[in-house]
């Protein structure tokens, strides 16, 4: 099967964070709530079109969150990486003791249906 992609196809990153305790997850949530808007303001100037912080709730007894970023183009993705690396560096300092597991994915949007 062959997929034809528009040159302007959106790129996205989707990262899942698994914590050992609810307290660690809530700290992570608070850090993003306190800093996410400011970070997105910087990223949107470089082509980030969406930021979404999520709490994963459907697996009982686990403490998981995820972060989604969407970008206009491969160039936008590359331009946002420095800002994200700086933010992540500071974030990881605060969460160093949390011993969290991060699962990262980079995606090309092939089909996106919306209302």
Residue ranges, per PLM feature:
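Active-site-flanking beta-strand signature of metal-NTP-handling nucleotidyl enzymes
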Residues: 10-19, 66
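Surface-exposed beta-loop interaction hotspot
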Residues: 4-9
């Amino acid at each position: 099967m062959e997929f034809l992609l528009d040159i302007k196809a959106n790129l996205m990153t989707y990262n899942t964070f698994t914590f050992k305790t609810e307290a660690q997850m809530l700290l992570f949530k608070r850090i993003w709530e306190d800093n996410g808007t400011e970070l997105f303001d910087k990223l949107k100037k470089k082509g980030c079109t969406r930021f979404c912080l999520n709490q994963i709730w459907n697996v009982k007894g686990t403490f998981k969150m995820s972060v989604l970023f969407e970008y206009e183009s491969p160039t936008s993705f590359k331009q946002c990486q420095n800002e994200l690396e700086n933010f992540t560096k500071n974030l990881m300092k605060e969460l160093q003791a949390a011993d969290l597991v991060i699962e990262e994915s980079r995606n090309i949007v092939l089909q996106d249906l919306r209302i």
